[in-house]
């Protein structure tokens, strides 16, 4: 059936986010099919850096300045350096309409992003960011134009034909994501060792959390890829939808290598061809102790783990093992 092309691919059963403040986060997703770590990591990284919307300054007007190659008396930085500093102001703004914000300050002192007077729906996220430095007696007034957008827009595209004299266009860095890196490692799922583990590190400007940024990027990819799906989702047959009534505890379908056992105990079970918990609990203590390299310490460890699950050695399971044990294990894996 065609749905097996995607339904039988393994999906991550572990997706963990670790945040460090509002600007940094790390995502760990595992297991993934071999090669999917690189595929998803690269796709998410590209979308995170290029396609998420944010706010940025698009133009600035400085009193007494006609163009960006000017200098201002009493201001240590020239206008070109001031414009470069303005590009780095991190802004969060609601709505799509263009907004204005103003800063006016007298020297001596440092003009920072926190000195900017904003309207209610604009928030400065890096108020300590330095814009320029004023000497004694110097004064500066700047008016900024702020817009929402995505990606990077060069200053030339922000220059309008009807712009007043002295309005200096600014390169706009709209993306709220500043850095993204990822790595792919091998990970284990059951007895298979060659699945992928994807780790992504993301740094934002604070207007969006790392976790939300990844969620938005994934949604963009989902929407873009949906246009290539040229068929309706096949309906599952009734017998596939019906859940088999088990005659035993679903926990018996869990594989013993998923238990938190010592290496010695796990190897002994593997060498004795004990794959599922259902295989294990039917063994008696005497049978276990006859297993090569299996001692009293390993026995006590296994008894303790089974007891935590309400199980013990020497149990009888008349219908064990079921004929379709692998299918049942997949079907009931979310119940143990």
From Swiss-Prot:
Keyword Cell division: no
A GO CC annotation given for this chain: DNA-directed RNA polymerase complex
Record region (Alpha N-terminal domain (alpha-NTD)): 1-232
GO biological process terms, semicolon-separated: DNA-templated transcription
Bilayer-spanning residue ranges: none
Superkingdom: Bacteria
Region (Alpha C-terminal domain (alpha-CTD)) location: 248-336
Keywords for the protein's UniProt record, in alphabetical order: DNA-directed RNA polymerase, Nucleotidyltransferase, Transcription, Transferase
Single GO term (MF): protein dimerization activity
Residue ranges of coiled coil: none
EC number: 2.7.7.6
A Pfam family annotated for this UniProt entry: RNA_pol_L
Key word Coiled coil present: no
CDD domains reported in the protein's UniProt record: RNAP_alpha_NTD
Top enzyme category: transferase
UniProt remark on domains: The N-terminal domain is essential for RNAP assembly and basal transcription, whereas the C-terminal domain is involved in interaction with transcriptional regulators and with upstream promoter elements.
Protein family per UniProt: Belongs to the RNA polymerase alpha chain family.
HAMAP family associated with the record: RNApol_bact_RpoA
Subunit structure: Homodimer. The RNAP catalytic core consists of 2 alpha, 1 beta, 1 beta' and 1 omega subunit. When a sigma factor is associated with the core the holoenzyme is formed, which can initiate transcription.
Functional description taken from the UniProt entry: DNA-dependent RNA polymerase catalyzes the transcription of DNA into RNA using the four ribonucleoside triphosphates as substrates.
Protein name, per record: DNA-directed RNA polymerase subunit alpha
Native source organism of the sequence: Sinorhizobium fredii (strain NBRC 101917 / NGR234)
């Amino acid at each position: 059936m065609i749905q097996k092309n995607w339904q039988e691919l393994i999906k991550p059963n572990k997706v963990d986010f670790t945040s460090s403040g509002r600007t940094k986060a790390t995502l760990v997703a595992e297991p993934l099919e071999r090669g999917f770590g690189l595929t998803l990591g690269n796709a998410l990284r590209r979308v995170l850096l290029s396609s998420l919307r944010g706010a940025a300054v698009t133009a600035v007007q400085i009193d007494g300045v006609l163009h960006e190659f000017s200098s201002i008396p009493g201001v240590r930085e020239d206008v070109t350096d001031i414009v470069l500093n303005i590009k780095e102001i991190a802004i969060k703004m609601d709505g799509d309409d263009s907004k204005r914000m103003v800063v006016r300050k007298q020297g001596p002192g440092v003009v920072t992003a926190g000195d900017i007077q904003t309207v209610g729906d604009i928030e400065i996220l890096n108020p300590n960011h330095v814009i320029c430095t004023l000497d004694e007696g110097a004064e500066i007034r700047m008016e900024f134009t702020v817009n929402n957008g995505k990606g990077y827009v060069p200053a030339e595209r922000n220059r309008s034909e009807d712009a007043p004299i002295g309005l200096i266009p600014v390169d706009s860095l709209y993306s709220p994501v500043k850095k993204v890196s990822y790595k792919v490692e091998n990970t284990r799922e059951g007895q298979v060792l060659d699945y992928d583990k994807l780790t992504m590190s993301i740094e934002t400007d604070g207007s969006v959390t790392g976790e939300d940024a990844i969620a938005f990027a994934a949604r963009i990819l989902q929407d873009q890829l949906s246009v290539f799906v040229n068929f309706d989702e096949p309906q599952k047959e009734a017998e596939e939808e019906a859940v088999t009534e088990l005659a035993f505890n679903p926990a018996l379908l869990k594989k013993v290598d998923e238990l938190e056992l010592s290496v010695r105990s796990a190897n002994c079970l593997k060498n004795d061809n004990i794959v599922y918990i259902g295989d294990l609990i039917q063994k008696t203590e005497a049978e276990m102790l006859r297993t090569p390299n299996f001692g009293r310490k390993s026995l006590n460890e296994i008894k303790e783990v089974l007891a935590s699950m309400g199980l013990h050695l020497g149990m009888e399971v008349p219908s064990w093992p079921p004929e379709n044990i692998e299918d049942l294990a997949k079907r009931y894996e979310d119940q143990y």
